[in-house]
Amino acid sequence: MADKVEKRILTLYSDVQATSVHWLWYPFIAVGKITLLQGDPGDGKSTMMMNLIAELSKGGKTPDGKPVGTPQRVIYQCSEDGVSDTIKPRLERCGADCRKVAFINEETYSGLTLDDERIRQAIIEFRPRLVVIDPIQAYLGSDSDLQIAGRARKLMQRLGMWASVYDCAIVLIHGLQLLNTRSEATADSGCHDK
């Protein structure tokens, strides 16, 4: 009878090599992590991201004036605006190098969801430094609901793994919808255990 190799369930923190966080825009957007940008409709979430995307694409500066360095690639996935009549003109007005900004064409590839393997494939092929999903609600899929914490955690774990493995920052834009049935504090989070 062969000796069984016993797997340890626990890992000691003393066995972990500490590393530092790499920032795309300190202290707001970390590389290898998910960032949630949320606010009320009309607060300028998408506009702020368009400006950041433009600066990244041309190697400009972060909103606080720090140099980006080398121009970076970005995937900007937006379901709320037209690509040719709204998104591209906005990018151009912001001064983006549109050769460094891409999207998954939803006319060709319909039914895109947050845990869709096509997002991972696009990240592998394009190697962006930043991926923006705008808004997160449009990419949940019919069987997902951010109000159910377990489902939301599963989606976030997968996206977080992709961000870490492929060394990119992922920003999820979330528009708040305050409901009269919940307090302001719980309405903001959008995710609750049921």
Could you say what each language-model-derived stretch is?
Residues 1, 121, 184-186:
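Residue-level detector of intrinsically disordered, flexible termini
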Residues 3-4, 10-13, 19-20, 24-26, ...:
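Conserved inter-motif catalytic segment of the P-loop NTP-binding fold
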Residues 48, 52:
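Hydrophobic positions on the alpha1 helix immediately C-terminal to the Walker A/P-loop
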Residues 57:
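Gly/Ala-rich phosphate-binding loop of Rossmann-like dinucleotide-binding domains
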